Amino acid sequence: MQIAKNLDCQIAYFSLNFETVKDLISAGHSVGVYENESIVIYHQSKTIPIAHVSNIPLTMNGKASFMIQNVLAAVLGTFLSGVRPEKISQSLKTFIPSPQQTPGRMNIFKFHDFNIMIDFAHNPAGYIAIKNYLATIKANKKIGIISGVGDRRDEDLQACGKTAAEMFDYIIIRQEKNLRGRTEKVIINLLVKGIHEVRSNFPYEVISKEIEAIAHSIIIAKKGDFVVALSDVVSNAIEVVQFYLDQETQSLKSS
């Protein structure tokens, strides 16, 4: 809103909160808003419902608020570019998130006894978004695989560790890539410092290589667990998880 005050052009707004933008709607601005669990556009005194979030796979049935934000921005921009609301609605309903369509964006792999999710979150804001999503997920135990990026500030790495400890029950730290001028030990120590802000005896272990960390998480995961791999090399993580899922599928077929 502060930025808008300094702009000299036509401005459209989007928000998760109707109260935040109701005055803008009354003033005649084009607005996309999350209202009554639906994506709605207000434009030229018209109220244009687009879709209920339960019909938008990208939002994970409305559980991923940051994905709703992304959808709002995309819908509003598309609508103002002249695409018909019906076309937008149909596109949202048929765009299915997957490792192929949206690699590294909440890719969920369903194993027989547990699930694994891969996401590209690698900064404090990304970790908080994942934390908010996981708060809606029921699981026996939530296991996180995390790492740090070397060119981040100390406080950012600590914040990632702290948020990880707030959303997971067990953490595997891996750190083989993106050292960017720091040593593996320094990055890990900063993550651990953040973890210990939550609990001094929080359970974690260090497995440097991502492939080995993911394999270990699959070995220790129990029925009803939810594993989250926050990866900075998404293609590798997807390939590894898919390999183990294919192995399990083949084994179940043979038994």
Region spans (language model):
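Extended acidic/charged loop-beta regions that coordinate divalent cations
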Residues: 1-57, 94-109
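ATP-dependent carboxylate-amine ligase
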Residues: 53, 57-58, 64, 73-86, ...
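Conserved phosphate-binding catalytic cores of ATP/NTP-utilizing and phosphoryl-transfer enzymes
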Residues: 67
